[in-house]
Amino acid sequence: LTSHLDEFIDLAETYLKRAPVPADSPDIGGVRGNIQRSTGNLISGTSTLALPNDFLEIYRLTFTGDTFSTLRYVAPNQLALNHRSGTGRPSFFTISDVIEFDIAPDSTYAYELSYYPSATALSDSNTSNFILATFPDVYLAACLFHAFRFLQDEQSAANWLAQYKQESWSASETYRLPRVSQGS
């Protein structure tokens, strides 16, 4: 069984990298981490922006230069309806394998992309990540689910899956809670 441990970890990480879903959902969700921020400048005439390697889910995209503004996310099919030809100041964006804008920028715009990261996979050179460091029970439950499936012990696998779903949702909720005290 121990010879398959790396496989169980790899399989667990496929779950951990998914978007979170409530514990009572029929789907199996992942764990959302603390919001990360990436800054840069949009390139004039280029209507796309590469996603960070650890991107899981968008939180906000803002222009941070002289005129601070938040761009509005729209579904991919809606971006086609909002598409403008030529160049200008983008107002809308969507996400595919890149961030796509409704219009190519007419200038260089400073931006801040706020997003939820996915967990970095464990390896010989990367022995920890934010989930393992903060929520080791989530890793354990996901790995044991796959181990018991491998052993064809469906009852134990179901128990560990239920625990994983509860723990992963709880871990994700930790990052959704307000960070500001409302006083006593």
Model-flagged regions — what are they?
Residues 1-184:
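Glycine-enriched, solvent-exposed interface loops adjoining structured elements
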